[in-house]
């Protein structure tokens, strides 16, 4: 007699690992090539299309790191206080207009260009001043409190590499080097749609058996956070003909199509067959939990990623697969999120052969930080994402996790705005 399964993941068969799926994405997806020039004020989050080469040193000149007195170190008496007349003043943007003479001190302020003839700055807190003369204590090293031209960035350096997603510090560096505009890749145009006869827009009447569409709004936010221009194509019914029409229309005007729902093996799941009718399906089942049914294909030459219908599986598969696809397509490099080793504050058993992503929060336990698993594992429990800090990742080979074992932790802050 056949054994009935009580585990929806029991009949996995030969499934792709997420590493294999990511390699497929790397091989099959080519970045956009169109660029545009934008002012710094609106460049945050955009992908830099060309290296920024420094055309100047940063800082552009030697300058003082503190408020104090600039002197020539050779003029200081090694074993006792040195008294010097203060004969000039240098402030940021108002440098001394002559070389400093031997045996004199120049009053200097933070950021001011070092006067010619000086090489050391004595902090004002370490000095005594009386009757126009400053007393400088012995023992200061030559070059103290002096910032050198080019110690941050040297002329000719690659200050920012192409492929960088521009953050606030990047824009500051670009501005400090005199750039008012930057060449960036144009934003991706992404078509987004949900599938399912049971799915309704929020606020609409909700008949028995229907649910409100959470996925489209989560995905829209995640896509916008990656700088995409999103076309919301709404909810499409569970009919192959309707999906074929929607996908064909979307492929004509977009760089990427993202769907949720309809990628499993049920009689009402038609995304897979629609993609096969219109183009090519590269894969559609992965050895991960949650999120086994995930489709990657092409429709009219446009990449399509079909995500599951359960909202937790949508989040996990987006972060694991869709996000790398989008960053590659957008021209971004070095976008792999950081994983952090933490101690497991829980025990857990899993089936070998699939990678699992467990929702967890970080808690302090003595001097250590531990990951505590959310109590319920269901792929439809959206509140588990809201109330967790990130995902504990258990590799395919793992079968049992004991308390105190080091695990990889992916914070949501690394991958979600």
What are these regions (language model features)?
Residues 1-19, 180-307, 311-317:
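Helix-rich terminal scaffold detector
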Residues 19-22, 36-41, 50, 93, ...:
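Flexible glycine/proline-rich
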Residues 13-20, 35-38, 42, 66, ...:
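Conserved active-site and cofactor/substrate-binding residues in soluble primary-metabolism enzymes
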Residues 26-33, 51, 114, 157-163, ...:
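Structural signal for hydrophobic packing residues in well-ordered secondary-structure cores
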Residues 1-81, 333-357:
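Short, low-complexity N-terminal leaders and the immediately following helix N-cap/first helix
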Residues 2-13, 52, 69-232, 368, ...:
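Short, glycine/charged-enriched hinge/interface segments at domain edges or termini
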């Amino acid at each position: 007699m056949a054994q009935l399964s009580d585990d929806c993941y029991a009949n996995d068969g030969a499934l792709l690992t997420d590493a294999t799926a990511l390699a497929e994405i790397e091989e099959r997806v080519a970045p956009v090539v169109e660029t545009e020039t934008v002012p710094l004020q609106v460049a945050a989050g955009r992908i830099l299309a060309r290296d920024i080469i420094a055309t100047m040193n940063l800082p552009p000149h030697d300058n003082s790191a503190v408020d104090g007195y600039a002197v020539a170190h050779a003029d200081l008496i090694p074993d006792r206080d040195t008294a010097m007349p203060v004969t000039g003043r240098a402030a940021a943007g108002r440098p001394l207009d002559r070389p400093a003479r031997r045996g004199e001190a120049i009053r200097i302020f933070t950021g001011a260009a070092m006067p010619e003839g000086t090489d050391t700055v004595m902090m004002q807190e370490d000095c005594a001043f009386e009757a126009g003369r400053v007393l400088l204590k012995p023992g200061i090293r030559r070059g103290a409190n002096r910032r050198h031209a080019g110690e941050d960035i040297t002329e000719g350096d690659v200050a920012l590499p192409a492929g960088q997603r521009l953050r606030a510090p990047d824009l500051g560096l670009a501005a400090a080097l005199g750039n008012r505009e930057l060449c960036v890749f144009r934003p991706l145009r992404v078509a987004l749609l949900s599938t399912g006869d049971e799915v309704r827009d929020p606020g609409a009447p909700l008949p028995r058996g229907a649910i409100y569409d959470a996925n489209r709004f989560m995905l829209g936010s995640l896509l916008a956070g990656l700088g995409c221009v999103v076309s919301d194509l709404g909810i499409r019914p569970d009919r192959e003909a309707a999906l074929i029409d929607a996908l064909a229309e979307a492929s004509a005007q977009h760089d990427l199509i993202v769907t949720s729902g309809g990628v499993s093996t049920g009689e009402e799941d038609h995304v897979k067959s629609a993609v096969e009718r219109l183009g090519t399906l590269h894969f559609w089942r992965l050895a991960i939990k949650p999120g086994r049914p995930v489709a990657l294909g092409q429709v009219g030459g446009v990449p399509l990623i079909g995500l599951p219908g359960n909202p937790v599986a949508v989040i996990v598969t987006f972060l694991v697969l869709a996000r790398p696809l989008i960053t590659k397509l957008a021209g971004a490099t070095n976008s792999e999120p950081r994983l952090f080793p933490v101690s497991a504050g829980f025990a857990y058993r899993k089936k070998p052969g699939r990678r699992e992503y467990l929702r967890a929060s970080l808690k302090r336990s003595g001097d250590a930080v531990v990951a505590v698993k959310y109590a319920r594992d269901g792929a439809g429990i959206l509140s588990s994402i809201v109330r967790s800090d990130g995902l504990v990742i258990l590799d395919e080979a793992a079968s049992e996790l004991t308390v105190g074992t080091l695990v990889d932790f992916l914070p949501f802050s690394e991958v979600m705005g």
